[in-house]
């Protein structure tokens, strides 16, 4: 609050509620945390595009996007856009997984490395926490070709799964999806 020069009078909470209601942000509580620790995520597609690729750019080439196809800036944008499209289509993802009828809460999750517990830092794009005591761990990867899970990436996914299990102490079945 102090960084944004807001008074501690509830006005900032009202602004966040308004932004969420209008679809500019979403809030979620990370599994294992209190509601007071909610995370707010900017989800408005144009606003994200503007801050990432337009603001503070000195580009006046009308063919800019055509000329960036295959370049890192374009690939980065495709990855970010794909992740947001997935987050906007959770009902369709649930349908493809065959769990449309299962009550599900969803969120992202992250943790810092913890040497004491022997876990690496991890971030999970999407968790589908299902009423049937299963949690789908979803990683969203954009690829212009068929995405192949390498041995190294498989190891990384298993590390994330282990970090999640250790930090949250969940007893639910964990499915990497």
Identify the residue ranges that each predicted region occupies:
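Short amphipathic alpha-helical interaction segments
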Residues: 5-22
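A short, conserved structural fragment
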Residues: 20-31
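A cross-kingdom feature that marks ATP-driven nucleic-acid transaction machinery
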Residues: 30-33, 38-177
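Short acidic, hydrophobic short linear motifs in intrinsically disordered regions
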Residues: 1-3
């Amino acid at each position: 609050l102090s960084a944004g020069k807001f008074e501690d009078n509830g006005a900032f909470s009202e602004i966040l509620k308004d932004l969420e209601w209008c679809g500019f942000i979403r809030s979620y509580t990370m599994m294992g945390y209190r509601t007071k620790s909610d995370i707010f995520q900017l989800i408005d597609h144009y606003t994200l595009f503007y801050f990432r690729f337009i603001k503070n750019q000195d580009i006046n080439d009308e063919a800019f996007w055509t000329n960036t196809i295959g370049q890192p800036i374009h690939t980065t944008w495709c990855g970010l856009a794909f992740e947001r499209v997935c987050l906007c289509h959770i009902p369709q993802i649930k349908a493809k997984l065959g769990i449309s009828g299962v009550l599900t809460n969803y969120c992202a999750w992250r943790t810092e490395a913890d040497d004491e517990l022997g876990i690496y830092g991890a971030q999970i794009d999407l968790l589908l926490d299902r009423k049937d005591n299963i949690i789908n761990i979803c990683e969203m990867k954009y690829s212009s070709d068929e995405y192949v899970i390498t041995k190294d990436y498989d190891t990384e996914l298993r590390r994330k799964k282990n970090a999640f299990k250790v930090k949250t102490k969940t007893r639910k079945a964990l499915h990497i999806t």
